[in-house]
């Protein structure tokens, strides 16, 4: 899917946000505890980092698509810089894995964050130093 989108939209920029899964829109095949308020709990990047197999699968697919066009990655529901850096470490691990397998992709793919919760807005200056872009 990402492969086809990247091909069709090139040379325009394709920004792909990683999944914003959580209790309010959880895939039934993923085990996750029931939350009193799923809108405030374990969702977005926190959910993805708690389920690395899901995040890694998506990141590898996005990286493969980056070989075909101007693709960038955006992480949702980032709380602070540490959230972003942790997600970037997972991305680097996926990139290293694909590189070792000889797959083509943009190793320098731009990586950004959505600023959609108050803590991200408060830390936006330090977040901006680590991100290639903010949305």
Model-based region annotation:
Residues 1-135:
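Conserved alpha/beta-domain cores
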